[in-house]
């Protein structure tokens, strides 16, 4: 039996790699997108039952759209697009960095939105299509750090309901998935992450596999279109005046 296909952007590293392995184990044909880590994506692809690697820099929206159109033309059952790739660079609410802002808005908001639109319009799927935008618990619990990144994630979050409302097929759905602090980020060392990763309501380290399970549920389960799930052990329910990366150093 033919396998349903999923495209995962940023699938060579971190959460994207966890997603690729989880979907592969669940019987999907996994299309791993990579930017600068093609060899790492190929290593993961070689371990999966059915997989392939595609490469492009998401800063170039036109090239990303060409990638989507190529996949739409040759995949017979492309059911899911997971926009997981993101750039995470520091700036702050009192000192926006124009270059960081431009890159964040392009890679974290504009390109994934355009990819979603092209996928929804052109992909062939048996049983409905799913878009899963990776967001951040910062959409509910913002702080002044990583200012441009956070703005871009808010922008992407705003598209979830709008894209969902625009779909005429009830089997086609658009979701948001918002993780919290889950892996060491930016310039953190593991000892710092051991502290920051527990800065949530349950005071526990959230396992990336929990996020992969949530994505798989969205891909094949029943959840109303336009919804966003938080997988952060309740971090978004806390008031945090700074990014936990910096709170862990205080």
Where do the language-model regions lie?
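Conserved glycine-rich Rossmann-like NAD(P)H-binding loop of the short-chain dehydrogenase/reductase
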Residues: 26-42
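Conserved glycine-rich cofactor-binding loop
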Residues: 12-13
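Catalytic loop of short-chain dehydrogenase/reductase
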Residues: 129-169, 181
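C-terminal substrate-recognition "lid" of short-chain dehydrogenase/reductases
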Residues: 209-231, 236-237
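Substrate-binding pocket helix/loop in short-chain dehydrogenase/reductase
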Residues: 78, 92-102, 196
